Amino acid sequence: KMVKFMLRGALHRVELERLWRVVGAPTLAPLRAADPGIVEKPLRPYLHARASLSERVTLLRQHYAFLRGRHAGLLARLFTPQGILLGSYPASEGESIRIVLRHDVTFRREGELSISLLNEAGQRLYSCAFNITERAGVRALVIGSLQGPEPAVVEPMALIQQLTKRGFGLRPKSLMVMLAFMLA
């Protein structure tokens, strides 16, 4: 694996150096600690299948340049498993469901940030992974995935129905998209 990375790195040195100029910044040290493979991301399919290596580097550079420029004070918290608490979701008595914004390494190809509904055990009940980028000079939020409960969650279909009831008819999937739009 290391040999492949070194060969690819040598072959695409200029592009990887472009990426490192952004993610190598001291303010992004928490990112590198949480996701040491960040530099490898453009070497594989990322965000959409047709993106070239140069486009993948640009997507990552734009995302992290935006975060560094606008939200540098939040970076350390974004790259922790706890992330930033955005709110809570209606839950049954004695239960807590958190809405969290964070960098989740599970979404290696789908996006650099995610909004997730998490139960008390920290299991993802629903997630939306995305990147912040620019298109024709206009900032855009690109959603890479919307995912339901992770495999460890018991009875996922029943859970989604319960979450929809608790949310007064608002489906978790719709909530994730609405929250992403609010962040944009």
Regions found by a protein language model. Give the residues of each.
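Acyl-donor binding region in acyl/amide transferases
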Residues: 127, 133-184
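Terminal substrate-recognition subdomain of acyl/acetyltransferases
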Residues: 1-112, 119-126, 134-139, 148, ...
